[in-house]
């Protein structure tokens, strides 16, 4: 992945899985208050992997008021393939909130990650990994924030951090 330019607004193109992982880690590290992520099941962003979970943990530990909101269509991937992320949710149940999107307004092919209303990563709905990340660009991030917040409010309740079995 190319280095982020010095002067805002800053655009970084994403064309491979390695560039996506580097961009996501950069976005998480730049977030100072809130991180919002929306994807059908979060697997495309590999949020269950060690590095993103470690970065999210560091973000949540940095300030008591920091928040992470994850919006998904299908909880199956989180329940079966993301034990690190679920463990993080158990440790930070007050700050890491996960919701399942409304069936009438699914996330679908939209894959976005937004940090602090200024930085945003968006992937295109293609077979390969193609997307872009903008830093210090509220003009690019604001429509994504509005769309995310609308879906978040219409989504179901927060998903439990503990299994609800007997």
Where do the protein language model's features map onto the residues?
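Short charge-dense sequence patches
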Residues: 1-11, 29-41, 94-103
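Residue-level marker of positions within ordered structural domains that often coincide
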Residues: 40, 122, 153
């Amino acid at each position: 992945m190319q280095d982020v330019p010095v002067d805002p607004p800053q655009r970084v193109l994403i064309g491979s899985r390695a560039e996506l992982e580097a961009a996501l880690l950069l976005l998480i590290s730049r977030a100072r208050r809130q991180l919002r992520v929306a994807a059908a099941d979060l697997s495309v962003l590999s949020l269950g992997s060690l590095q993103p979970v470690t970065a999210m943990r560091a973000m949540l530990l940095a300030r008591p008021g920091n928040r992470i909101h994850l919006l998904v269509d299908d909880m199956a991937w989180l329940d079966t393939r993301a034990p690190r992320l679920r463990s993080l949710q158990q440790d930070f149940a007050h700050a890491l909130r996960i919701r399942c999107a409304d069936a009438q307004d699914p996330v679908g092919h939209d894959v976005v990650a937004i940090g602090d209303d200024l930085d945003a990563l968006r992937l295109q709905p293609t077979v390969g990994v193609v997307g872009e990340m903008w830093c210090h660009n509220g003009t690019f991030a604001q429509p994504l924030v509005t769309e995310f917040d609308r879906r978040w409010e219409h989504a179901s309740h927060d998903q439990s951090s503990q299994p609800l079995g007997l």
